Amino acid sequence: MKGNYKLKWHKFTIYFALFTLTAITLFAAVPFFIGKTHAVINSSQIIFNNAQIYAQHPMMQTYDILFGIFFVMYAILIVITRQKLAGFKKDALQLLYTCLGVSVLIPAAYAVTNIVVIGFLRIYFYLIVVSMIAAVILFLIYAVYYGKRKSLFTN
């Protein structure tokens, strides 16, 4: 406990949530680099058809690699944010809110890119929507929680 504040959620965030988010983000980047991002479901089977997509839309491969790089950069931002939160740095909360914003922007930008380049969005649409809703909910939770503890971040 720092001051009169209980910091269980803070400790959960810095010791588990942000490390887990970093691992998930890096794991999510892998398909973009190895060409496993475009799939169709065919009678309970997922079939990746990147070769077909890339043949019809050559720029999509470049976009996929670019988004893989975005995910890696986002993972680095998460680690920096975790370190700043752990040290109660002055800019830590702004970085946390930025991370939550980026977690909405990257999937949204990827969805828009797919719709513009390919003309439609594959099976990941629901995952994108769920991740965006989760980010908004987390933003609200963190805003309330850290809003009450803003005075701790003075370093």
Segments predicted by a language model, with ranges:
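Topology signature of small-to-medium multi-pass alpha-helical membrane proteins
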Residues: 1-155
